[in-house]
Amino acid sequence: MARGCLCCLKYMMFLFNLIFWLCGCGLLGVGIWLSVSQGNFATFSPSFPSLSAANLVIAIGTIVMVTGFLGCLGAIKENKCLLLSFFIILLIILLAELILLILFFVYMDKVNENAKQDLKDGLLLYNTENNVGLKNAWNIIQAEMHCCGVTDYTDWYPVLGENTVPDRCCMENSQDCGHNSTSLVWKTGCYEKVKMWFDDNKHVLGTIGMCILIIQILGMAFSMTLFQQIHRTGKKYDA
């Protein structure tokens, strides 16, 4: 009976982590594709030049892959050391997520202030050499989200000159449409537009967050249950 429970738990744990590992592979693939095909699109922040969408997806995909692999191997080999490592990694990730979430809400005003200032500093690099990625990133978000600048279109004046904004700020994009024509440009800043997008999609994002939390808790529960079941059977393993 005990052996049957062990086998059942083992294969449930293996299947769970196989899906987890495949998700990591998918994220890693998407991140590499973004890095290769969209390599000229970079971050908006001069303080964190490596914090691009591609690098972020690659990092998350790698963590998920490694964690899933540990879980798969620990389950199929019935190795307590690997199962414990899997549990500890998930616990660390969960605690880190909770700490970051708490800090974000506690210091939300400070985060908003620093983020806006950092983005404005990034605008100064818009037409400089070796910053084509930053320029492309701003052009895309302004065209796609119908916004201009960080807080509003006047953020571009110290960068491009009085009454001048990038052409992608224009409601109807055409060459040099942003020169001395502020009446036909998007007035809302991109920072506010992004906040509005998050607010409009908060239910979807909350659901995704809850699903991730449930998956992490299930993974920890499966690993500890299997760990205890292996321990009870009295099997011996090499650490």
From Swiss-Prot:
Keywords: Glycoprotein, Membrane, Transmembrane, Transmembrane helix. It is found in: Membrane. Its main location: membrane. It holds the Pfam family Tetraspanin. Residues 1-13, 77-85, 225-239 are cytoplasmic. It is a multi-pass membrane protein. GO terms for cellular component: membrane. Residues 35-55, 107-203 are extracellular. Glycans are attached at N180. It comes from the Eukaryota. PROSITE patterns: TM4_1. The chain crosses the membrane at residues 14-34, 56-76, 86-106, 204-224. Belongs to the tetraspanin (TM4SF) family. This is Tetraspanin-9.
